[in-house]
Amino acid sequence: MTDLNDNICKRYIKMITNIVILSLIICISLAFWIISMTASTYYGNLRPISPWRWLFSVVVPVLIVSNGLKKKSLDHSGALGGLVVGFILTIANFSFFTSLLMFFLSSSKLTKWKGEVKKRLDSEYKEGGQRNWVQVFCNGAVPTELALLYMIENGPGEIPVDFSKQYSASWMCLSLLAALACSAGDTWASEVGPVLSKSSPRLITTWEKVPVGTNGGVTVVGLVSSLLGGTFVGIAYFLTQLIFVNDLDISAPQWPIIAFGGLAGLLGSIVDSYLGATMQYTGLDESTGMVVNSPTNKARHIAGKPILDNNAVNLFSSVLIALLLPTAAWGFWPRG
């Protein structure tokens, strides 16, 4: 009887806690909306953000991050960073949000997939991924900055990607998509390639065979996975455009977004591999037979110099792809 009462008490406390948290979130959303309305009235040229958008931008990232903590996809510092990134991208543009969401969900699933196999291959493998704030920053800093610039340029809301009518805003949209697709492509390649590939990876700089897990090692399976990862993010962006953008009939076609995402995923993975092969140390610990990312007395050098770590490589790859691809896309993008 005591155990039953304890369970009822715990459920009651949990229910009350959820109600209190939801009430606080609603209050925060309303406070942001009031600030938005005040700023719009004072400055005159600012478009107020609806209370529903504020509410969605606060509630949904909280729910996603809470689920990520529960499933060990994030640690506590990663959850805090994820809240900031999620809020800014969601309030800026729902297409940004869905792209980020698909990247996070797919990456988390693939990180856990075949975990026992990856444990034997990766000396730094963590159960569930457990991404910390550094990893969140290196994957989310570029999209977050672009989302802020987008809001300054265009204000919150969804727009068609159309260089002939809104060059700067369209460039930033594609740049943000490129950064997320690059991160997705690299993650899909590193999580799927080592498990499914039947052949040994080859170092991207010399094309020599290297052990599984070597930074800069590529396989056909990994490259195809990176293409699919970027395409997956591109599809999420494209579908959100179809739902939320009103004037698509008088704008440039949006379907190239899907191809752009796939290209960003593939090229991002290639750039990441090249940086990893040249600026990231890889050695083989002969006592364990596992690949390591830092020099030790027992490690035999395979490739790279200890200049960058994996997080820095991811950040540099994201920056390069985000800067270069939208400019290249401008020359080929259909005109409305």
Curated annotation (Swiss-Prot):
Keyword field contains Membrane: yes
GO cellular component: membrane
Compartments in which it is found: Membrane
Annotated membrane topology: Multi-pass membrane protein
Transmembrane segments: 15-35, 49-69, 84-104, 218-238, 257-277, 313-333
Cross-referenced InterPro entries: DUF92_TMEM19
Principal location: membrane
This protein's UniProt keywords: Membrane, Transmembrane, Transmembrane helix
Pfam family, one: DUF92
Similarity-based family: Belongs to the TMEM19 family.
Record protein name field: Transmembrane protein 19
Species for this entry: Homo sapiens (Human)
Organism ancestry: Eukaryota, Metazoa, Chordata, Craniata, Vertebrata
